[in-house]
Amino acid sequence: MGTTELSIDVGMTDANRTGVYLAILQLVFTLGWTTYAIYLPELAAKVGIAPSAVIFILMLDQAIFTVTDTAMGIAADRIAPIVGRLGVFVGALTVISCAAFVALPFVAGTGPGAQHWFITLIVIWAITSSALRAPPLSLLGKYRAQPSIPFLSALAMLGYGLAGAVSPYLGVALRNRDARLPFVISSVVLLITALALSRVERYLARKPSQPAKPRGVTEPLGRKSAIFIAAMVILALGYQLHFSLNSAPFYLRFAKPADLEWLMPVFWIGFNIAMFPASVVVKHRGGLIVLGIAGLLGALAVLGAEFAGNLNTLIAAQFVAGMAWGCMLMSAISAALAIGHAGAEGKVLGLVFSALALATFARMAAVAGGLQKLPEYAPLLHWAPVACWSVAGAGLLVLASFRLPQSGRLPRV
């Protein structure tokens, strides 16, 4: 084996370690959010908050994420030129976030008099936890070679997909258990994982796989970026409506409620499997093209789920829909890093996560308004995912076809 081949192998190993770390971080963070969502109704009741108001607390969380995800991404871009500073920034905010998170069940246990403190802790937790979304992923664009980014994005999103797959089982496992121990365990694991980011950042800075990028010369995000983010809002809304509102009723046409914990993860199995082969296509053709094709494929899969005549057909359609969403999210991360390649990686990634949060807020608003229970809105909710994924997918394909030719020094979007 020659020196060049050995260097490539070592570089790929280092890159894979970074991707695995980010996957673990996303897994632990998402499972912590799931734990919070499972216990929130119980904790809210202890401080005198009515069950009907819990959805509004969750909407508040998403509204905060919509703002702070972008803000944290911008902050990451400004901090990143000083090696090690980003890890310290994320670590410090994670300490605050975990402290607020651990305190929630203990404060709730003191009764209705602690209601204001309970809400305050939730707000603090939501604001500070945004530091764990876009900023760590921005390291991929700052230190990793462009051809490796799609695969590393797939690795990072694997943590998110695994968390989605195990969430139904986590809900069953935590049923009727005291909230304090799960909150403490998830916070400790998340804190340990997040504090390792500084070490990862310094290691990447010592062994960069691409030349240092000029900082402070970031071009303003133009029309293409705005269209990309708008498309992400639409795609994310399609996912929210399909998976969170429509998937369970689809399954209940052929299965019993007790079977849902085994059927719902089918979507996430497809999600996790499809990202890696799709990352090869993104490497050669760019994220926007894969994002658009995945949107159209997902729309066809939702149509298949809508018209499925038996459980096996529905399972296959849900599997394909999960594949499509996995390809969308992986290629969106890759495209965001390419768009922000000259020092705005965190900002564009933050906008992507803000788009996801905004779509989640919209879905929760629909639930809070009871739209899924109104017969006149049922067709809208059923067909909205098809419309969202097909329209956004087609628009992204058009955008990709009209992109300007790239020079050899610029990443493929």
Q: Where would I find each of the regions flagged by the language model?
A:
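Helix-to-loop junctions at the C-terminal end of transmembrane segments
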Residues: 68-83, 274-287
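Helix-loop boundary and gating motifs at the non-cytosolic
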Residues: 2-65, 226-231, 236-253
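Intracellular juxtamembrane helix-capping segments at the cytosolic ends
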Residues: 131-144, 327-341
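A late C-terminal transmembrane helix in Major Facilitator Superfamily
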Residues: 343-374
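Glycine-rich segments within core transmembrane alpha-helices of 12-TM secondary carriers
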Residues: 150-172, 353-364
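A membrane-interface helix-boundary motif in multi-pass transporters
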Residues: 86, 172-189, 368-392
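Juxtamembrane intracellular "pre-TM" segments in multi-pass secondary transporters
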Residues: 2-15, 203-230, 413
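Structural signature of the two symmetry-related core transmembrane helices
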Residues: 86-103, 289-303
